[in-house]
Protein backbone atom coordinates (compact mmCIF):
# COMPACT_ATOMS: atom_id res chain seq x y z
CA UNK A 1 0.00 0.00 0.00
CA UNK A 2 1.02 3.59 -0.49
CA UNK A 3 0.04 6.75 1.31
CA UNK A 4 -3.36 8.09 0.23
CA UNK A 5 -3.69 10.68 2.97
CA UNK A 6 -1.33 13.33 4.19
CA UNK A 7 -0.32 12.01 7.65
CA UNK A 8 -0.22 15.55 9.06
CA UNK A 9 -3.83 16.10 7.99
CA UNK A 10 -4.92 12.66 9.15
CA UNK A 11 -2.93 12.24 12.39
CA UNK A 12 -1.65 15.73 13.17
CA UNK A 13 1.91 14.48 12.76
CA UNK A 14 4.27 12.55 10.50
CA UNK A 15 6.66 11.49 13.27
CA UNK A 16 6.24 8.71 15.85
CA UNK A 17 8.48 8.14 18.88
CA UNK A 18 8.65 4.49 19.95
CA UNK A 19 10.52 3.16 23.01
CA UNK A 20 10.85 -0.63 23.10
CA UNK A 21 13.06 -3.37 24.53
CA UNK A 22 16.29 -4.11 22.65
CA UNK A 23 15.96 -6.69 19.84
CA UNK A 24 12.21 -6.94 20.37
CA UNK A 25 10.75 -6.33 16.92
CA UNK A 26 10.85 -7.81 13.42
CA UNK A 27 13.53 -6.47 11.10
CA UNK A 28 11.16 -4.90 8.56
CA UNK A 29 8.29 -3.80 10.80
CA UNK A 30 9.37 -0.17 11.31
CA UNK A 31 10.25 0.34 7.63
CA UNK A 32 6.91 -1.21 6.63
CA UNK A 33 5.00 1.17 8.91
CA UNK A 34 6.94 4.21 7.66
CA UNK A 35 6.26 3.27 4.05
CA UNK A 36 2.60 2.44 4.52
CA UNK A 37 1.75 5.59 6.49
CA UNK A 38 4.27 8.06 5.07
CA UNK A 39 5.80 8.82 8.45
CA UNK A 40 9.16 8.70 10.24
CA UNK A 41 9.60 6.49 13.31
CA UNK A 42 12.19 7.46 15.92
CA UNK A 43 12.91 4.10 17.52
CA UNK A 44 14.89 3.85 20.75
CA UNK A 45 15.50 0.98 23.15
CA UNK A 46 15.66 0.25 26.87
CA UNK A 47 16.77 -2.86 28.77
CA UNK A 48 14.71 -2.68 31.96
CA UNK A 49 11.29 -1.48 33.07
CA UNK A 50 13.00 0.68 35.67
CA UNK A 51 15.04 2.56 33.05
CA UNK A 52 11.83 3.13 31.09
CA UNK A 53 10.12 4.48 34.22
CA UNK A 54 13.01 6.85 34.99
CA UNK A 55 12.89 8.25 31.43
CA UNK A 56 9.14 8.87 31.70
CA UNK A 57 9.51 10.51 35.12
CA UNK A 58 12.19 12.77 33.64
CA UNK A 59 9.60 14.06 31.18
CA UNK A 60 10.88 12.42 27.99
CA UNK A 61 7.95 12.19 25.58
CA UNK A 62 7.29 8.93 23.75
CA UNK A 63 4.21 7.96 21.75
CA UNK A 64 4.35 4.17 22.21
CA UNK A 65 6.16 2.26 24.95
CA UNK A 66 6.21 -1.47 25.75
CA UNK A 67 6.39 -2.07 29.53
CA UNK A 68 5.78 -5.32 31.40
CA UNK A 69 2.58 -6.03 33.33
CA UNK A 70 3.71 -4.80 36.77
CA UNK A 71 5.11 -1.56 35.33
CA UNK A 72 1.87 -0.91 33.42
CA UNK A 73 0.01 -1.39 36.69
CA UNK A 74 2.29 1.19 38.31
CA UNK A 75 1.97 3.67 35.41
CA UNK A 76 -1.83 3.34 35.59
CA UNK A 77 -1.81 4.02 39.34
CA UNK A 78 0.30 7.13 38.77
CA UNK A 79 -1.89 8.47 35.89
CA UNK A 80 0.99 8.25 33.44
CA UNK A 81 -0.95 6.56 30.61
CA UNK A 82 -3.80 7.55 28.32
CA UNK A 83 -6.58 5.19 27.22
CA UNK A 84 -6.27 3.44 23.86
CA UNK A 85 -8.64 4.53 21.10
CA UNK A 86 -10.39 1.32 20.04
CA UNK A 87 -11.76 2.91 16.87
CA UNK A 88 -8.27 2.24 15.44
CA UNK A 89 -8.10 -1.37 16.63
CA UNK A 90 -9.21 -3.53 13.70
CA UNK A 91 -6.89 -6.48 14.42
CA UNK A 92 -8.35 -7.75 17.69
CA UNK A 93 -9.93 -11.00 16.46
CA UNK A 94 -6.74 -13.01 16.73
CA UNK A 95 -5.64 -11.91 20.21
CA UNK A 96 -4.91 -15.06 22.21
CA UNK A 97 -7.52 -15.51 25.00
CA UNK A 98 -4.70 -16.62 27.32
CA UNK A 99 -2.85 -13.32 27.00
CA UNK A 100 -6.10 -11.36 27.27
CA UNK A 101 -6.84 -13.10 30.59
CA UNK A 102 -3.37 -12.15 31.85
CA UNK A 103 -3.81 -8.56 30.72
CA UNK A 104 -7.20 -8.32 32.42
CA UNK A 105 -5.55 -9.05 35.78
CA UNK A 106 -3.88 -5.64 35.84
CA UNK A 107 -5.80 -3.73 33.13
CA UNK A 108 -9.40 -5.02 32.97
CA UNK A 109 -10.78 -4.88 29.40
CA UNK A 110 -7.52 -3.40 28.12
CA UNK A 111 -8.41 0.23 28.62
CA UNK A 112 -4.72 1.21 28.52
CA UNK A 113 -2.73 -1.70 27.13
CA UNK A 114 -2.51 -3.98 24.10
CA UNK A 115 -0.58 -7.26 24.53
CA UNK A 116 2.51 -7.66 22.34
CA UNK A 117 4.44 -10.70 23.64
CA UNK A 118 3.85 -13.00 26.58
CA UNK A 119 5.68 -15.80 28.26
CA UNK A 120 6.61 -17.70 31.37
CA UNK A 121 9.62 -18.59 33.49
CA UNK A 122 10.63 -22.24 33.58
CA UNK A 123 13.44 -24.77 33.42
CA UNK A 124 15.42 -25.65 30.33
CA UNK A 125 16.93 -29.09 30.87
CA UNK A 126 19.13 -31.52 28.98
CA UNK A 127 16.84 -34.45 28.17
CA UNK A 128 19.81 -36.84 28.03
CA UNK A 129 20.93 -36.06 31.58
CA UNK A 130 17.76 -35.05 33.44
CA UNK A 131 14.93 -37.51 33.99
CA UNK A 132 11.59 -35.84 33.23
CA UNK A 133 9.92 -37.99 35.92
CA UNK A 134 12.30 -36.51 38.46
CA UNK A 135 11.44 -33.02 37.19
CA UNK A 136 7.74 -33.71 37.64
CA UNK A 137 8.30 -35.16 41.10
CA UNK A 138 10.60 -32.40 42.40
CA UNK A 139 9.51 -29.35 40.42
CA UNK A 140 11.56 -26.30 41.37
CA UNK A 141 13.27 -28.34 44.10
CA UNK A 142 15.29 -30.14 41.41
CA UNK A 143 17.48 -27.03 41.60
CA UNK A 144 18.60 -28.29 45.03
CA UNK A 145 19.07 -31.93 44.02
CA UNK A 146 22.80 -32.53 44.59
CA UNK A 147 22.90 -34.95 41.66
CA UNK A 148 23.03 -31.73 39.59
CA UNK A 149 25.50 -29.79 41.78
CA UNK A 150 27.73 -27.51 39.65
CA UNK A 151 25.43 -28.18 36.69
CA UNK A 152 22.79 -25.47 37.02
CA UNK A 153 22.32 -21.88 35.86
CA UNK A 154 20.28 -19.49 37.98
CA UNK A 155 18.92 -16.31 36.41
CA UNK A 156 20.72 -13.35 38.00
CA UNK A 157 17.60 -11.51 39.11
CA UNK A 158 16.27 -11.25 42.64
CA UNK A 159 12.70 -11.17 41.40
CA UNK A 160 12.95 -14.38 39.38
CA UNK A 161 15.05 -16.22 41.95
CA UNK A 162 12.77 -15.37 44.86
CA UNK A 163 9.80 -16.38 42.68
CA UNK A 164 11.42 -19.82 42.23
CA UNK A 165 12.11 -20.21 45.96
CA UNK A 166 8.67 -18.99 47.08
CA UNK A 167 6.91 -21.27 44.58
CA UNK A 168 9.08 -24.23 45.64
CA UNK A 169 7.93 -23.59 49.22
CA UNK A 170 4.27 -23.35 48.20
CA UNK A 171 3.93 -19.58 48.72
CA UNK A 172 2.76 -16.76 46.47
CA UNK A 173 5.51 -15.03 44.51
CA UNK A 174 3.87 -11.76 45.57
CA UNK A 175 3.88 -12.51 49.30
CA UNK A 176 4.57 -9.64 51.71
CA UNK A 177 4.94 -12.03 54.66
CA UNK A 178 8.50 -11.66 55.98
CA UNK A 179 8.52 -15.17 57.49
CA UNK A 180 7.87 -16.61 54.02
CA UNK A 181 10.43 -14.29 52.43
CA UNK A 182 13.06 -15.27 55.01
CA UNK A 183 12.31 -18.94 54.35
CA UNK A 184 12.83 -18.29 50.62
CA UNK A 185 16.11 -16.53 51.48
CA UNK A 186 17.30 -19.63 53.38
CA UNK A 187 16.20 -21.84 50.46
CA UNK A 188 18.33 -19.78 48.06
CA UNK A 189 21.28 -19.71 50.50
CA UNK A 190 21.21 -23.49 50.71
CA UNK A 191 21.02 -23.75 46.92
CA UNK A 192 24.03 -21.43 46.67
CA UNK A 193 26.05 -23.40 49.23
CA UNK A 194 25.30 -26.92 47.99
CA UNK A 195 24.73 -26.50 44.24
CA UNK A 196 27.32 -23.82 43.34
CA UNK A 197 25.13 -22.40 40.56
CA UNK A 198 26.40 -20.00 37.91
CA UNK A 199 24.38 -16.76 38.00
CA UNK A 200 23.76 -15.58 34.45
CA UNK A 201 21.50 -13.50 32.23
CA UNK A 202 21.57 -13.51 28.41
CA UNK A 203 24.72 -15.65 28.17
CA UNK A 204 22.60 -18.61 29.31
CA UNK A 205 21.34 -19.02 25.72
CA UNK A 206 24.66 -19.92 24.12
CA UNK A 207 25.77 -21.84 27.20
CA UNK A 208 22.75 -24.18 27.09
CA UNK A 209 22.97 -24.53 23.31
CA UNK A 210 26.56 -25.71 23.92
CA UNK A 211 25.46 -28.16 26.67
CA UNK A 212 27.51 -26.38 29.35
CA UNK A 213 25.06 -27.29 32.16
CA UNK A 214 22.06 -29.58 32.61
CA UNK A 215 19.40 -27.23 34.03
CA UNK A 216 18.77 -23.49 33.72
CA UNK A 217 16.11 -21.09 34.97
CA UNK A 218 15.07 -19.15 31.86
CA UNK A 219 12.35 -17.08 30.25
CA UNK A 220 10.25 -19.03 27.76
CA UNK A 221 11.41 -16.97 24.76
CA UNK A 222 15.05 -17.75 25.51
CA UNK A 223 14.05 -21.38 26.04
CA UNK A 224 12.30 -21.49 22.66
CA UNK A 225 15.48 -20.23 21.02
CA UNK A 226 17.72 -22.69 22.92
CA UNK A 227 15.47 -25.64 21.97
CA UNK A 228 15.34 -24.54 18.33
CA UNK A 229 19.17 -24.69 18.29
CA UNK A 230 19.69 -27.85 20.39
CA UNK A 231 17.20 -30.70 20.14
CA UNK A 232 18.50 -32.31 23.35
CA UNK A 233 16.96 -29.47 25.36
CA UNK A 234 13.42 -29.43 26.78
CA UNK A 235 11.31 -26.89 28.68
CA UNK A 236 9.40 -27.56 31.88
CA UNK A 237 7.05 -25.32 33.88
CA UNK A 238 6.91 -26.76 37.43
CA UNK A 239 3.50 -27.75 38.74
CA UNK A 240 3.94 -25.53 41.83
CA UNK A 241 3.34 -22.66 39.41
CA UNK A 242 5.53 -19.94 37.98
CA UNK A 243 5.57 -16.35 36.81
CA UNK A 244 3.60 -15.71 33.64
CA UNK A 245 4.07 -12.27 32.16
CA UNK A 246 3.13 -10.04 29.29
CA UNK A 247 4.74 -7.00 27.67
CA UNK A 248 2.13 -4.69 26.20
CA UNK A 249 1.98 -1.55 24.09
CA UNK A 250 0.72 1.58 25.85
CA UNK A 251 0.54 5.32 25.14
CA UNK A 252 2.04 7.67 27.76
CA UNK A 253 -0.14 10.50 29.05
CA UNK A 254 2.30 13.07 27.61
CA UNK A 255 2.49 11.48 24.13
CA UNK A 256 2.55 14.14 21.41
CA UNK A 257 1.13 11.93 18.64
CA UNK A 258 -1.62 9.73 20.12
CA UNK A 259 -3.54 9.18 16.85
CA UNK A 260 -0.49 7.84 15.08
CA UNK A 261 0.37 5.85 18.23
CA UNK A 262 -2.99 4.04 18.09
CA UNK A 263 -2.49 3.35 14.38
CA UNK A 264 0.97 1.89 15.12
CA UNK A 265 -0.35 -0.36 17.92
CA UNK A 266 -3.01 -1.75 15.59
CA UNK A 267 -0.37 -2.23 12.86
CA UNK A 268 1.76 -4.28 15.28
CA UNK A 269 -1.16 -6.69 15.72
CA UNK A 270 -1.25 -7.45 11.96
CA UNK A 271 -0.55 -11.09 11.18
CA UNK A 272 2.45 -10.25 8.95
CA UNK A 273 4.09 -7.84 11.39
CA UNK A 274 3.39 -10.07 14.42
CA UNK A 275 4.85 -13.02 12.48
CA UNK A 276 7.97 -11.06 11.50
CA UNK A 277 8.50 -9.99 15.13
CA UNK A 278 7.87 -13.40 16.66
CA UNK A 279 10.33 -15.10 14.30
CA UNK A 280 12.97 -12.45 15.07
CA UNK A 281 12.43 -12.39 18.84
CA UNK A 282 11.46 -15.97 19.77
CA UNK A 283 8.82 -14.95 22.29
CA UNK A 284 5.21 -16.05 22.07
CA UNK A 285 3.11 -13.66 20.01
CA UNK A 286 -0.14 -12.25 21.37
CA UNK A 287 -1.55 -13.15 17.92
CA UNK A 288 -2.83 -16.72 18.25
CA UNK A 289 -2.73 -17.36 14.48
CA UNK A 290 0.99 -16.56 14.47
CA UNK A 291 1.51 -19.02 17.34
CA UNK A 292 -0.53 -21.70 15.52
CA UNK A 293 1.50 -21.22 12.32
CA UNK A 294 4.93 -21.22 13.98
CA UNK A 295 4.04 -24.27 16.11
CA UNK A 296 2.72 -26.32 13.20
CA UNK A 297 4.51 -29.21 11.53
CA UNK A 298 7.77 -28.32 9.84
CA UNK A 299 7.69 -24.72 11.09
CA UNK A 300 10.27 -22.92 13.26
CA UNK A 301 8.76 -23.92 16.63
CA UNK A 302 7.23 -27.28 15.68
CA UNK A 303 7.11 -29.36 18.90
CA UNK A 304 8.81 -26.56 20.87
CA UNK A 305 7.09 -26.59 24.27
CA UNK A 306 8.58 -23.24 25.28
CA UNK A 307 7.02 -21.36 22.35
CA UNK A 308 3.43 -22.58 22.62
CA UNK A 309 3.43 -23.12 26.37
CA UNK A 310 0.43 -24.04 28.53
CA UNK A 311 -0.37 -21.11 30.84
CA UNK A 312 -3.47 -22.66 32.39
CA UNK A 313 -2.02 -23.75 35.77
CA UNK A 314 -4.03 -21.79 38.40
CA UNK A 315 -0.87 -21.57 40.54
CA UNK A 316 0.81 -19.36 37.93
CA UNK A 317 0.95 -15.70 38.90
CA UNK A 318 1.48 -12.27 37.39
CA UNK A 319 4.10 -10.22 39.23
CA UNK A 320 2.77 -7.30 41.31
CA UNK A 321 4.87 -4.20 41.83
CA UNK A 322 5.96 -3.48 45.40
CA UNK A 323 8.67 -0.85 45.91
CA UNK A 324 9.49 -1.69 49.53
CA UNK A 325 9.77 -5.39 48.80
CA UNK A 326 11.99 -4.76 45.77
CA UNK A 327 14.64 -3.17 48.02
CA UNK A 328 14.43 -5.98 50.60
CA UNK A 329 14.82 -8.71 47.96
CA UNK A 330 17.59 -6.82 46.19
CA UNK A 331 19.63 -6.58 49.41
CA UNK A 332 19.02 -10.26 50.20
CA UNK A 333 20.04 -11.29 46.68
CA UNK A 334 23.38 -9.50 46.96
CA UNK A 335 24.01 -11.26 50.29
CA UNK A 336 23.22 -14.67 48.78
CA UNK A 337 25.61 -14.25 45.85
CA UNK A 338 28.59 -13.14 47.97
CA UNK A 339 28.30 -15.92 50.57
Where are the regions that the model predicts?
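Hinge/lid segment of periplasmic solute-binding proteins
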Residues: 2-12, 54, 73-118, 132-141
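Early extracytoplasmic/lumenal segment of secretory-pathway proteins
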Residues: 2-74, 78
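Ligand-binding "clamshell"
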Residues: 76-83, 107-111, 225-237, 299-302
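Short beta-strand->loop
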Residues: 82-93, 113, 231-243, 252-255
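Short loop->beta-strand "edge-of-pocket" segments that line small-molecule binding or catalytic clefts
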Residues: 141-156, 169
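Ligand-binding pocket segment of bilobal, Venus flytrap-like solute-binding proteins
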Residues: 153-157, 161, 165, 173-238
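Mature extracytoplasmic/periplasmic domains
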Residues: 252-313
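Conserved C-terminal helix/tail region of periplasmic/extracytoplasmic solute-binding proteins
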Residues: 309-339
Amino acid sequence: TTVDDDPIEKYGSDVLNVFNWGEYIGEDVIANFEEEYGVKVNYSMFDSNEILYTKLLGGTSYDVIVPSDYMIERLMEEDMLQPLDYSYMTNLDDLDPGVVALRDEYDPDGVYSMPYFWGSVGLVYNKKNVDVNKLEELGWNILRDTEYADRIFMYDSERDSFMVALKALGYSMNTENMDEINEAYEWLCELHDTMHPAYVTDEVNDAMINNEKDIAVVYSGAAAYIISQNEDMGYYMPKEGTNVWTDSMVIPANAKNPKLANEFINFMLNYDEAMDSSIAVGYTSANKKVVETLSSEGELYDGNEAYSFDASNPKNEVFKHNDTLKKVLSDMWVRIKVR
